A protein has these predicted regions:
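Amphipathic alpha-helical segments used for helix-helix packing
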Residues: 94-98, 109-134
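N-terminal intrinsically disordered/low-complexity leader segments
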Residues: 1-18, 157-158, 207-228
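Basic, helix-initiating cap at the start of DNA-binding domains
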Residues: 1-34, 39-47, 64-67
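Amphipathic C-terminal alpha-helical segment
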Residues: 106-109, 149, 153, 173-190, ...
């Protein structure tokens, strides 16, 4: 009985992780440019150059693919664009301003506005599926929390003592989201700078105190009218 020659295992030619990344790249771009509902699996497979079997091995359903795009790509975009810069800034206000200005400058150089990746999908999918909505809401929550935590850090250093961290964070996120929606519609990144200036005026401690004073006067007037 002769010994069989040893056979070296052949070099692996397939790349599951590379394939998965390619599908995510294509899906992310299509969902942002065309929308989730307008992006068919057939179109995505053709653009990625994969078979149905290969696609479904990684993403059994279109919803699973959307969740992966949201949890891996959109969350990473918010982390890189917003959370990390705010955390690294000297203060929450400085961080928010730097993000607005950086995004506006990038859009001006780019020449077009595709919108906020999170905002785009939130508008389309929040009422379409509870799991997709929960994934999107989780990113919004982490975004607001990061800004609020930065305000609290400022307060520990003796700054922003008259600022409510959660309200400031909600206002910053809402202002940016709205500004990006308007900039996308108008194809004009200048809206971001306008909204940043308004945010600076409306979110300052002095403005907040003035607003509270106005609200108190309004309540007093209403009570006087009720007395008649």
């Amino acid at each position: 009985m002769t010994a069989r020659p040893k056979v070296r295992p052949g070099k692996r030619t397939n790349d599951p992780e590379g394939l998965r990344k390619r599908v995510l790249d294509v899906a992310e771009a299509s969902f942002q440019a065309r929308g989730y509902h307008a992006s068919s699996l057939g179109d995505l497979m053709a653009a990625a150059g994969v078979t149905g079997g290969a696609l479904h091995h990684h993403f059994p359903t279109k919803k699973a693919l959307a969740l992966a795009v949201i949890e891996e790509r959109v969350a990473a975009a918010v982390e890189a664009t917003w959370i990390a810069p705010v955390q690294a800034a000297g203060s929450a206000r400085e961080g928010v301003r730097s993000v607005f200005e950086a995004v506006a400058a990038e859009l001006e150089q780019q020449g077009f506005v595709r919108g906020c990746p999170l905002n785009n999908l939130a508008h389309e999918l929040s009422l379409a599926d509870p799991d997709l909505r929960a994934a999107l809401a989780g990113i919004f929550s982490a975004w607001r929390q990061a800004i609020a935590d930065k305000v609290r850090a400022d307060q520990q250093a003796g700054r922003e003592l008259d600022t409510d961290p959660q309200r400031f964070a909600a206002l910053a996120v809402a202002t940016y989201s709205g500004a990006m929606s308007m900039a996308k519609t108008a194809q004009d990144s200048g809206v971001l700078r306008d909204c940043l200036n308004a945010l600076g005026q409306g979110a300052s401690p002095a403005s907040s105190s003035k607003g509270e004073a106005v609200a108190k006067r309004r309540r007093r007037v209403l009570r006087q009218y009720k007395a008649f």
